[in-house]
Regions:
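Active-site-facing substrate-recognition patch
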Residues: 1-35
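Short glycine-rich phosphate-binding loop at a beta-alpha junction
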Residues: 34-45, 118
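Structural detector of well-ordered beta-strand residues that form the stable sheet scaffold
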Residues: 39-40, 62, 115, 139
Length: 148
């Protein structure tokens, strides 16, 4: 195993159309047997991934803000989330999973159900276990050990 960086910068990957397309195809293939109503991603890093998956799968998109804005619609969730919607959540990188779990809680608090989440790179610092304890399966496309 090589030395892993303290910070994994996914911005280059999530702004590259070819890489985004590959990520979207992998996730879409994985959910093709599921009855998913919405694809969600927390701002900012996951929004391009969620958008790419939405376009590839033709499943409507939700964007989850970190906090409500004091202006405009002041919504935490942008997009139409209906009571009982099955939602998959995507993220670029997870460490402990805290920020993604916060986004999932926002979806659940607004009537949605989340059973699966996808992350491009898992840093292997407890996120999978944290998700398991919440009843959500976190599925990394790659782990930091595979990446570095």
């Amino acid at each position: 195993m090589g030395k892993e960086p303290d910070n994994i910068n996914m911005k280059k990957a999530i702004t590259d159309p070819e890489i985004l397309s590959t990520i979207a195809k992998l996730i879409t293939k994985s959910i093709s047997e599921d009855n998913i109503d919405k694809v969600a991603g927390p701002a900012l890093g996951a929004v391009p991934i969620a958008t790419a998956v939405s376009l590839e799968s033709e499943i409507p998109l939700l964007m989850i803000r970190k906090e409500k804005k004091g202006y405009g619609t002041s919504k935490l969730i942008e997009g139409e989330l209906n009571e009982g919607d099955d939602v998959i959540v995507v993220e670029d990188v997870t460490t402990t999973g805290g920020s993604l779990l916060k986004a999932i809680k926002a979806i659940q608090d607004n009537g949605g159900s989340v059973k699966r989440a996808f992350v491009v790179v898992d840093r292997q610092e407890g996120a999978i276990e944290a998700f398991d304890s919440e009843g959500v399966k976190l599925e990394p496309l790659i782990t930091v050990d595979e990446f570095f």
